[in-house]
């Protein structure tokens, strides 16, 4: 994996986020890393009581893309996003609900019911609203962030983080 992985991933996440219809995430159990990124791409998130959320990128020596960090901050709040990313904190289902990251506490049936309800609404109204909401979240990538992102993805720390994860040991990062 390298930065081309992130480029492809970001393309997938942006495609999901900009689909012309509402998207719903039904979350049960772990919603970590890539799962969290997929949930961030969805419009509405429904979670069971046993769901938990996190982006443990620092444990692997990598940086998630700016798109993810931006959506995380806008959906969780800047303080909670910083706590999650900068300490690898895992949030419970109740935390996610309290912070507004999840909109409904329920199961797959609850998510399917919301999706069904949305099909009764005017498609162009939904599309216009979704485009407007997505514009609130749009910002240009900053060169400073891009440089930090490239340094992390090209670092020995990333290799060490992945190796330590595979070997089930604590990583030794050198920065």
Explain the meaning of each model-derived region:
Residues 1-28, 68-70, 151:
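An acidic, glycine-rich surface segment that forms the CoA-thioester-binding/catalytic face
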Residues 6, 10, 33, 66, ...:
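Glycine-rich phosphate-binding loop at the start of an alpha helix
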Residues 9, 69, 78-81, 111, ...:
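A general structural signal for well-ordered alpha-helical segments in protein cores
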Residues 12, 16-18, 32-85, 110-114:
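CoA-thioester-processing core
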Residues 84-85, 129-132, 149, 165:
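Short alpha-helical scaffolding segments that buttress acidic/His motifs in well-ordered protein cores
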